[in-house]
């Protein structure tokens, strides 16, 4: 009887210790999960909200929209001001947006599946404010455009190829002071004067101070049949533009 009581006590102690280990392990796992996500969230965004942001020149500056569809899907029509980094490329192009880890990042695709996968990749790589927007097949966006958008570094690289016409949509005085190589001066109100200076079969690059004035020019050129790429980063934002006199 004495030995049996000793065995029962040992069993109780073992069970108690095992329960404590399980509970402690669960708490640690929960805490670890919180640490991995406490500074980063993925929030669903309604299409109407994104449309509102894209049509507000002040609000749109607070967001970067990334269309993670393939290039041909993006070129067929995309949300205004969205850049294109496909889901298949996003891991290899993290450096292109590494300076924006604290900015509001909106990802979008056709149905929401690829954009959610992209958001998870961004989350794992330190991006903190992520929004997964309704896909273009789920919501009828009013802000769709065929004007492509790139960031300042890529814009400079495109200019350097010499394969594009370039339009500077800043004030004429600022253009006269310095501008991107080969650029001509113009704005949305002088499109009629610009057209004779732009070969029809040659794609056009547009830029300004912040991307707004140049986008207005870009949309009018796109409506006139040109392939247009606009710089989201203007000369006030991307200080590495190679400006010449």
Residue ranges and their predicted role:
Residues 67:
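Phosphate-rich cofactor/ligand-interacting catalytic cores and adjacent structured alpha/beta frameworks
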Residues 19-22:
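Hydrophobic membrane-insertion alpha-helices, especially the h-region
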Residues 2-12, 16, 26-55, 59-63, ...:
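Rhodanese-like catalytic fold shared by cysteine-dependent sulfurtransferases
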């Amino acid at each position: 009887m004495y030995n049996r009581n000793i065995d029962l006590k040992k069993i109780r102690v073992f069970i108690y210790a095992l329960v404590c280990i399980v509970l402690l392990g669960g708490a640690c796992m929960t805490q670890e999960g919180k640490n991995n996500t406490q500074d980063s969230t993925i929030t669903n965004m309604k299409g109407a909200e994104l449309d509102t942001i894209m049509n507000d020149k002040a609000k749109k500056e607070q967001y970067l929209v990334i269309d993670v569809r393939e290039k041909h899907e993006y070129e067929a029509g995309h949300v205004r001001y969205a850049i294109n980094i496909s889901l298949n490329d996003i891991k290899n192009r993290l450096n292109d947006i590494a300076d924006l880890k604290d900015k509001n990042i909106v990802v979008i695709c056709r149905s929401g599946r690829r954009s959610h996968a992209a958001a998870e990749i961004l989350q794992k790589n330190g991006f903190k404010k992520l929004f997964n927007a309704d896909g273009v097949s789920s919501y009828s966006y009013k802000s769709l455009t065929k004007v492509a958008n790139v960031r300042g570094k890529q814009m400079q690289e495109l200019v350097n190829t010499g394969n594009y016409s370039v339009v500077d949509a800043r004030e004429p005085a600022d253009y006269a002071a310095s501008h991107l190589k080969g650029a001509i001066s113009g704005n949305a109100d002088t499109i009629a004067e610009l057209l004779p200076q732009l070969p029809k079969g040659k794609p056009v690059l547009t830029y300004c101070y912040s991307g707004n004035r140049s986008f207005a020019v870009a949309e009018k050129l796109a409506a006139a049949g040109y392939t247009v790429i606009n710089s989201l980063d203007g000369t006030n934002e991307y200080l590495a533009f190679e400006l010449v006199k």
